Amino acid sequence: MTSTEFPYALTRVGVLMCPEPDNDLEAEGVLNPATVRSADGRLYLLPRLVAAGNVSRIGLAEIKVADGVPVDVAREGVVLSPERVWEQGAQNAGVEDPRVTFIPDLGLNVMTYVAYGPLGPRTAVAVSSDERSWRRLGPVTFEYDDEAGVDLGLYPNKDAVFFPEPVRDPDGVLSFAILHRPSWDLQDIRPGETARPPLGLPDPRPSIWISFVPVDAVQKDLAALARWRGHRVVAWPETPFEQTKIGSGPAPIRVDEGWLLLYHGVVGELVPGVAQQQNVSYSAGAMILDAEEPWKVVSRATAPLLTADTDDERDGIVPNVVFPTALERIGDDRFVFYGMADSKIGVARLDVR
């Protein structure tokens, strides 16, 4: 399927949020937000706020809408800070890049985020019945897969997001499904250690995986949301704009064709040990996952839906970045919220061709 045949497109709207010049918590940018709705229907942004030294917190800001379009935000403070030991390293700390999925079956907002602690980036889970008070369920643990000979718990993991409704896993068990992106290179946390991908993995580049949590386990113990099993690859990098790695964006949404997943694709050179890369380019891609078997890709755009073309997307802490992380319906339209050059937050409209 070519990009012109792919049934969805993104149309750039503009910049939604910039760092406040005198706000120390935003000294190194606002970026990569989640979104959440309050009980009375108000829409909130949960931006990643980056202080000096690349220390990140998760903020809260109400989104202001004019004529059906998000145009501004009103800041309301911080909802999550790196306060746990596993969110802090000797020379680093952070809670980063949140994704939030409202799961009606649980009546909860489920947040995945990156805990940047002593072992590098690890995925963690938190839950909330509103937009302000988040209960940590802790870092994710991965059931060991002896067939692949891999313990995913050994590896850095980012870009995790829950599906909004249960699906049946490959064994037919009704489960909550999660997309995530493990990386096999351990040099950032163990210099000199070579990459050790799972046995038989045909492509070692960071790719999109899926894991599952049985619904009945969560009904017995909410903390099971952080215990994942049944891991398998969904998609590898394929096209020129994503030759280095790919990672999930907002929670997938149900469309006529299946599950629509927006994601980011990266091309360029990654320098080991560098948190804020300077020689890469991030773009927004899209694929359709099967409605019943979401580990199967039905179709995929062969070109990016949005690339770093404006000054706000090209110039920043990490240049040349479009990083979609949230998707919301406002009136008759859907809007995508994305990080711009690791410095600002932009908005694009999701259009049906």
Give the predicted meaning of each segment:
Residues M1-E28, N32, V36-A93, F102-A160, ...:
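Beta-rich carbohydrate-recognition and catalytic domains
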Residues L327-R329:
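Electrostatic interaction modules used in gene-expression and signaling proteins
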